Each structure stands twice: as structure tokens, then as C-alpha cells.
Design a protein with these regions (language model features):
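Shared catalytic-loop signature of beta/alpha-barrel
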Residues: 3-22, 26-134
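Active-site and glycan-interaction determinants of carbohydrate-active enzymes
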Residues: 137, 149
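C-terminal hydrophobic helical "lid"/dimerization subdomain
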Residues: 139-141
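Intrinsic disorder at enzyme termini
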Residues: 152-153
């Protein structure tokens, strides 16, 4: 279903018992409000790197929370995107109304792409490790990451 097809999302949602996620191509809390009010999705999936950063993510999570809709960040890109998503979910309150089945009930979650990706696998000085379905939240200042300047230069576009 293309992102702008709200009715298509609703048809998919009504035809399945599986929770429907969407919104990775939506950029604002106002856009997510349309998805949620129309009953298009069970899980809002904002991409923090394209939807206005951590501040807009918090706004989206607030709107979703009013309607009892779960929020799980869409993460498809660099190690910086993973760090931003980890920071976002670490700051979120537990969500008791989630549509996700146990054992994930109330656990903060994010999408974690495992396809080969040099911007995810090479860009950071220390990579994130997915172990037992968990990723450690960095405890350094900011996003808690350091960029490898040589790798950044390697992928620089003029």
C-alpha cells in the first residue's frame, strides 16, 4: 500500500488480525494523526532521521499515545539513525496499550535492519551490537556515538 492511500491501509487492517505498522514516509505529528484517526495503523513508525528529529518524534508519540497507538521507530540507515532511535525509545514511557502480543508487551522496540549497509557497519567508531534481541543504549553525551572521520570522508559527496 502506498503511504498516501489511507483507505488501502484501512482495508489491510480490517482484513487481518496482524497489527499494521506504517508512517515511515510521514514527517509530522499532523500526518500521523491522520493515519491514526482514520484507523489506518496499529503501530506508528516514524523515521526519526526524516521526520523532524527527536522533537517531532516526541510529538508523534504524544499524539499516538492519546489514541492508544503504539510507536516503534522505523530505522533504516546509518549508525546515527540507530543511535537516534535508541535515544528516543529510552526516553519513552512504557506503553501499556500496545497491540503487540506478549512477550513484547510494554517493551520499547525499534526496527533493526540487518541487511549489509556500510553506513551502519562502518561509520561509527564503535558499532552497535544486537544481542538477545537487545541493543545497549549508549551512555555518553549526545547520541552517545563517535563518527569515524575517515569513513565519513570516504562517503562524502561533493
Amino acid at each position: 500500500v502506498v503511504p498516501e492511500d489511507f483507505e488501502g491501509y484501512c482495508r489491510v487492517r480490517s482484513a487481518t488480525k496482524i497489527a499494521v505498522a506504517g508512517g515511515e514516509c510521514e514527517y509530522t505529528a499532523f500526518g500521523f494523526k491522520r493515519y491514526i484517526e482514520r484507523g489506518c495503523i496499529d503501530i506508528a513508525q516514524p523515521d526519526i532521521c526524516v521526520s523532524g528529529g527527536l522533537t517531532e518524534f516526541q510529538r508523534i508519540a504524544a499524539v499516538a499515545g492519546v489514541y492508544g497507538t503504539a510507536v516503534i521507530p522505523h530505522v533504516w540507515g546509518s549508525g546515527v539513525a540507530i543511535a537516534a532511535a535508541l535515544a528516543a525509545i529510552a526516553a519513552m514511557p512504557l506503553f501499556p496499550h500496545t497491540a503487540n502480543p506478549v512477550p513484547f508487551q510494554n517493551e520499547p522496540m525499534m526496527e533493526y535492519d540487518r541487511n549489509p549497509n556500510p553506513l551502519r557497519d562502518e561509520l561509527l567508531v564503535e558499532n552497535f551490537e544486537l544481542k538477545d534481541r537487545k541493543v545497549k543504549v549508549p551512555d555518553k553525551e549526545g547520541l552517545g556515538i563517535d563518527i569515524d572521520d575517515k569513513v565519513l570522508e570516504k562517503y562524502r559527496v561533493l
